[in-house]
Amino acid sequence: MKDAFSESKIAGIKLRNRIIRSATHEGLADDFGNPTEELIKKYEDLAKGEVGAIITGYAAVMQNGKSPLINMLMIDKDEKIPYYTELVDRVHQYNTPIFLQITHCGRQTFSRTTGMPTVAPSPIKDKLYNEDIPHELTDSEIDEIIKCFVIAIERAKKAGFDGVQLQLSHGYLLSSFLSPHMNKRNDKWGGSTENRFRIVKKIMERAREKVVDYPILAKMNGYEKSKDGIKLEEALIIARNLEKASCDAIEISCGIAEEGFVGIRGEFPFDMIAQHNHLMQKMPKILYPFIKPVLKHSFASPEPRYLYNLDSAIEIKKNIKIPVIVVGGIRKLEDAYNMIQREQCDFIAMSRPFIIEPTIVKKFKENKQQQSKCIDCNYCQIGVEKTPVKCYYGKM
């Protein structure tokens, strides 16, 4: 019988167990987007803690796709490969697979960060980043982005990563192409689900020509809060399309950034937002008592607080044969066991529990702990805008 600690494989890559560290922005790259010694040590700690596999924090495939969050990884130049090779070799010493998540932030950034205009499938302003209306990508610009994703996959392979994960969730560029909420085009890149999926399909086709059977995973939304966003019915179609496009495994998440704490449930960290968020810093503090209830109503996380992507993962797993990974509000060892034993998913992924306890998998395995110490205060999610990721445990 399968259980959370049984050995398993993704695209032939052996995992010691079925618990994965989901992609988490650490804010520990250097000024050029190369991994630093401090970041490598964080990954070594995860590997020593016996995690099944690590998915790195996101790495941008080109300069105009760079995140406004501090010290993002970049995979936009060949010169970066040796830095990543060092990272991979250090993690592999502990027999832990590591996958590089690659992305383009699209409209979820600032032109002052990238030095270029923000871009998107459609000229729709992001409500959270509040940047100028993004430039609508042309055919040739879309083709250049596809090329950059493919080259990034080639670089990841050369660096020794066990595979890559395409970031198709949370409102970043590929996510915004997939979502009818953000993609209002009426050409071959918009309209039908097939057209909105076209950019992902092209990335997969061209990547397979270059790297053949190199593992390519994807992280996608099972649903979005926006009325015209992706719903489960369309997520099933996208998942089937990913399988047809030779994707090796799919991680199920939800939500986009401007929808607030949909994809990362828990407490509404107003004090942390007031101190770190660029929009709040422009407002007079005298208005904070009036702003707080409005923001909490608009952006606070909905229910349920835990296992909130499980229903989507169950339905998607029924429709595809490749492995399904579920992330979101997984905090108890019992839940991890149940999801795997009941075959509701093939793997589980966590993010915040690893921020507070890099060795949580080892503690689970040795039965020293039954639940994560994470209190879902979400301070870490806001603090990383300006400082490297850490657990605040609900305190400033």
Features from the language model and the residues they span:
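Flavin-dependent oxidoreductase catalytic cores
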Residues: 1-396
